[in-house]
């Protein structure tokens, strides 16, 4: 009898053991980022687990087959059939569409801009994110308007469509698209940025980031993330009409082609007569394919084409304190109607990602773009107060930049332990080849106007003909090797160490007649940049105190093409400390202080010089909060004291010691409040924002200034249950007259000394007056 009982027990135990099935897997979002703290449950039982920091899980299910459910905050629930024949599963969860506080305050989002896939709360650096919900609420579809929402970032737009950014007192920055560098800004500082028709979010990383992204990243990084394919069919369409006879159409759709292949297609078309008659036309289209043959491998292909036209705006002549001449209406566009900036860009990249069983990843990126900037403009205005006339005595300036960079990047990420220390590490290599040609032309037909009445100007008639006569070439090869190590000493105490070695090799041919022989010059640099940071969480998952130090390097190319002066590379360091607060996607606060030192500072534009050191110190506050249910607020403040160090001026030169750096407001402030009723009038929303920018100097001599200004903007919208949204946005509600951009004495000059008395030395651009945008959109 005992033997029978034992035998029966053994059989039952065997059956119980046999019925247990071990399932392992990973959970990622649609961008391939691991999702921690996902609840994994087996339906019909109490069996459950959660994913770890790498999105991995192991669960023993009490039967041969069944269904697992996956749930996480800010993601749609997901169900997956599993069994003995599927011991390993790879799950992709789609981000949920919730009310504004959950969407806007994305505290748990792991940021692409920090490379190590670290949560924002943990990252010992200042990062600001404008996600799709924010862009939609404020109807933002360009980088200039997006940058105004971030403390410490001052966007500057000159010569029609050339965009650059002053970040923490300096205009050295790097623009990334999906983590891939746009080298145009590092060569000539400014370049057009395409519309946001296919943009998912924008990440701003402030301060030097040479260890992660290579040369020229002193002020910071701007990473523009495009929309990705999804596992379910999703799409949206948006139509906007507005002031200045503006219309904008955007459409996008994505989803599965098969179980392993997904797509995303986006397109946008914008046309406007523009404020002051400054016309603009943008066309943007893109395709992304994502292929996942199994849970370990992902292949991504992306192609984009944009063709943009920007009308000219040379501004209006002004006094050095930023006031237009009292006999000129600042709202008149004095530029020749035939002047233009055209930008055509074709971009491609291929990405491959492999996930190893031990948790590491291998990433490969290959990218190429072909960009043409065609520019023609009478930049300098000559005016005669007696006759109230305008002339363009210099004639138009023309160039065509053709930029073709090829970039290759390899990253290997992995984790390991040394004694009690946990490491998350990345090592990588980048290689880039840049080919750039600049063609200059002479206008042989369609001369510039002279003695044009300013009251009722006729600003250009007929076509212009440009004959290419000169060329300048640039070829650069940059090879970089880098590492970062995220070390966890304890659950609340972590250290980030990073370093990068760059080898820079450039060959340059000065501007010459296209019939002349090249005169090549060579420049070679070796440089090491670093980052060291500490992160401590006194209150776990709520508060982080951090401190960091990082460095910067920028090749200045061999000389100034206008004067022939040879310049040294610019270098710099930053020290930063701050506090971050986050709570369940209801609160996201960063308070940071910084000190930056820059060596071999370059100043000027028309005539450039290298003057030694410059410094920037300040603090910033960025806060997002849901004050109560339905009321969301975003506040940003930046204090930036950036100045040039002690100088020994050359004979005849102005002493600029301790002068403020150009384009740097000492104080800037923005605040936006958005309210959505939760019961009565549910679906309606209203928002109000205020933006303040302090006065800014436009030259290193501090002799030309744009006054401070304050703007009030607003929005009202209705979100219907059928996914239709109608919104009205009003910019500059109080119809304030203000000036936000300018051409200074650094940019303006006279070809003939006899004309100098009539030449404008300061041409300012007024910002848009009160204007409206009405948008209707549909998503599915």
What do these predicted regions represent?
Residues 294, 403, 422-424, 430-434, ...:
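Structural signature of Gram-negative outer-membrane beta-barrels, strongest in the C-terminal barrel
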Residues 351-367, 371-379, 544-546, 569-648:
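Membrane-embedded beta-barrel scaffold of Gram-negative outer-membrane proteins
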Residues 309-321, 435-437, 505, 535-576, ...:
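Surface-exposed extracellular loop regions of Gram-negative outer-membrane beta-barrel proteins
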Residues 155, 164, 180-206, 225-227, ...:
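Short acidic/polar hinge/loop motifs at secondary-structure boundaries
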Residues 630-633, 691-699, 718-780:
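C-terminal beta-signal and adjacent terminal beta-strands/loops
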Residues 491, 595, 612-700:
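Gram-negative outer-membrane beta-barrel transporters
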Residues 28, 39-43, 71-75, 85-134:
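Short, acidic, small-residue-rich periplasmic hinge/interaction motif at the N-terminus
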Residues 183-184, 198-200, 211-285, 293-297, ...:
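Outer-membrane beta-barrel translocator/receptor signature
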